[in-house]
Amino acid sequence: MNVPMADEWFDCAIRLDSETIAVHEIFNSDLSKLLNLHSKTVYMSDLCAFISGCVNRNVGKLTIYWHVYGDIIYALTGILHCVKITIECGERIADGRYRLYEIPKLFLMRGQSTPLELKWKHAVGIATTNKPLLTHVLTDVLETSPFTLPDTLLSVQELSIFRERLSYIYYVLGLDVDIVARTEREIFQKCAELARLQQVFLIQGNIMENFVLVQACLFQLGADGLWEEMSGSVRPRPELMSSAFIQHRVMVNNCYCLAVIFNAIYKHKVSLPTVERSHEIVHRVVQEYYKSYVNAPLSVLVCATKVLTLFTEEYNFQSALVFVSQFFQVDVEASRADVIRLFLACLKGD
């Protein structure tokens, strides 16, 4: 058959144009019921959106964890227990484009051992369909934000299920609420160890709350992190769910605004006062952020450190903007790569 190829993925499907995708179709009524769909088949893009809680992600692979999604894994494979499975929907070819497999590859992940390829429990085919690229997405307007996040930063959109899952993970891991299951204790301990390395909190809250939010934000930005493992390792608790949860939106907004100011400081470095190295302390997060810049002078690092200090005193940008206005007007933006780099700098340990 003529296997579809394209330049990018759309939630485990191939994006053919602005309105059309080529996608694997799973003929599995049990899976359809689990996803609350009214059909006898399930598109891989729908499964991807259900597991991730987001749409418009440029991904061609999906990992599903047993602890939370055991019923889905059983419906797909017939396996009675495992840690996780991975579904690969295609591959990158020589010209840089992506090609859809005739049948997606299904793997049982076994720790450090080589993944074991599995057979599908039900038939899988390829369908071409007109599918809206963004459906049922949530948007927020943060009135206190001094800068507007660009559309390019928000290309990945979240569904209500993402916020509901994030809200209970935020409370379960952040407040250590009745963690009984071994899988949940293990992910809590793993997160707690990494959380202790954090250099800066980007939102008011405790160390675990900040860590959970950073991981969720990195996931939405398309960066590597622990969010998939976290969301697959903590079972839903309806009493802790809230589709109105927006702490992660506040956090990504704070990170973006800091990155904008940091970029402006570098752009207007000639306007900054000269400083003496022996008298100034530079924050480690600032040092990490500017590593990708060419010869960022000490005056830039000191100014950015002052901005970071002013922000974390009250978690707003009023004082920081008043401070930098002595030297220049903020007239730049920040890219997705800038925001990811700042998030990673905040997580970095010694």
Swiss-Prot record:
It comes from the Viruses. InterPro entries: Herpes_U59/UL88. Belongs to the herpesviridae U59/UL88 family. This is Protein U59. It comes from Human herpesvirus 6B (strain Z29). The lineage of its organism: Viruses, Duplodnaviria, Heunggongvirae, Peploviricota, Herviviricetes. The gene is U59.
